[in-house]
UniProtKB/Swiss-Prot annotation:
Family from the record: Belongs to the ABC transporter superfamily. Lipoprotein translocase (TC 3.A.1.125) family.
Domain ABC transporter positions: 6-231
Source species of the chain: Neisseria gonorrhoeae (strain ATCC 700825 / FA 1090)
GO cellular component, one term: plasma membrane
Enzyme Commission number(s): 7.6.2.-
Name of the gene encoding the protein in the UniProt record: lolD
Name of the protein this chain belongs to: Lipoprotein-releasing system ATP-binding protein LolD
GO MF entry, a single one: transmembrane transporter activity
Primary residence: membrane
Function per UniProt: Part of the ABC transporter complex LolCDE involved in the translocation of mature outer membrane-directed lipoproteins, from the inner membrane to the periplasmic chaperone, LolA. Responsible for the formation of the LolA-lipoprotein complex in an ATP-dependent manner.
Entry binding sites for ATP: 42-49
Assembly and binders: The complex is composed of two ATP-binding proteins (LolD) and two transmembrane proteins (LolC and LolE).
Amino acid sequence: MSDLILKCEGVGKRYRDGGLDVPVLYGLDLEIRTGESTGIIGSSGSGKSTLLHILGGLDMPSEGRVLLMGEDLRALNQRRLGDLRNRHLGFVYQFHHLLPEFSALENVMMPLLIGKKSRKEAVETAMAMLDKVGLKHRSTHRAGELSGGERQRAAIARALVTQPKCLLADEPTGNLDRANARNVLDMMLELKTELGTGLVVVTHDDELAGRFERVMVMKDGSLHPRQGANA
């Protein structure tokens, strides 16, 4: 079986602004494989987040195509696209987006319940994932009772609880201090190895990006390997 999860072929993106086409991405090619970590760095407005949204099927390219597990995302109806995305992708953002009225455990359980797992199975699986991220002892605490680093750990647990093929993270440490940022990234890389999950992280932090196996630089809508980055 191929270990290829995501593939971009000639991906371009334009937006309409006042009757004009504004290009954002130009002819991008990219492959993401099982167990591989990729950092995408670039200045604000370079197109990093736009690319991540296209990789995740949250936006569609204007040109080219994106294949997820061999399926062209543009060829799918919304229901099939949602099913494929929910089954194979996890998402983490700069802000945790935990639901404040629920506990850490209930937040992490949610994707499993949406996926029609029984409550018993959801509790057991979510608790095991909270244990992996070091939050089992905080499982009954609501988001407002957790520290910033703990909230992001809970968000990562929620993204990985369904064991997706790939985790897409948009500035996941951008709202944390340096120590917490390092700890969260360490945890993500450990879980990537343990679970065999592909990992794509958009970041402006050059130091953190150096921890990934591959680093790509986004500049003026084009994507290139960083010179001297790990292969």
